[in-house]
């Protein structure tokens, strides 16, 4: 998949992790915006045409489920991928609530890229 001009919004309250993931996504060809919590993510979604959201679950102000709920209403064609170290029950609940997928923090970059690519491809055909 051609990643040039595809935009990922990385949402995580851990600045260092957000920066590291963003840098890797940029090196893979994506354009990336970042947010420290769900409220900041909503601002980014309002300002930019985001292709996919990669979000943590535990964050201050608005957690990943809160962000997912708003995204499903305001940007239903924008896939949300959870990127978290949480237990499997949180992962299953995220998918049940409408997340495209869940990727465990620490996963291989190729796995993350494959998931983001697939999310964008499927949303383009929806």
Predicted regions and their residues:
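Non-catalytic signal-transmission and effector/linker regions of two-component phosphorelay proteins
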Residues: 1-7, 110-126
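Short hydrophobic/Thr-rich beta-strand motif most characteristic of the beta2 strand and flanking loop
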Residues: 29-36, 44
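Acidic catalytic/metal-coordinating carboxylates
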Residues: 37-40, 63-66
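Active-site residues of response regulator receiver
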Residues: 56
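Receiver (REC) domain active-site loop signature in two-component systems and cognate sites
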Residues: 59
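Conserved acidic segment of CheY-like receiver
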Residues: 5-16, 21-25
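Alpha4 helix (beta4-alpha4-beta5 surface) of REC/receiver domains from two-component response regulators
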Residues: 66, 86-114
């Amino acid at each position: 998949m051609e990643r040039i001009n595809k935009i990922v919004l990385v949402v995580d309250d851990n600045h260092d992790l957000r920066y590291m993931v963003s840098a890797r996504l940029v090196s893979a060809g994506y354009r990336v915006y970042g947010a420290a919590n769900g409220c900041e993510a909503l601002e980014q979604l309002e300002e930019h045409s985001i292709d996919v959201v990669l979000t943590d679950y535990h964050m201050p102000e608005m957690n990943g489920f809160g962000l997912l709920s708003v995204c499903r209403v305001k940007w239903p064609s924008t896939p949300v991928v959870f990127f978290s170290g949480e237990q499997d029950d949180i992962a299953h609940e995220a998918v049940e609530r409408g997340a495209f997928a869940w990727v465990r923090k620490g996963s291989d970059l190729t796995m993350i890229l494959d998931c983001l690519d697939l999310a964008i491809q499927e949303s383009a055909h929806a």
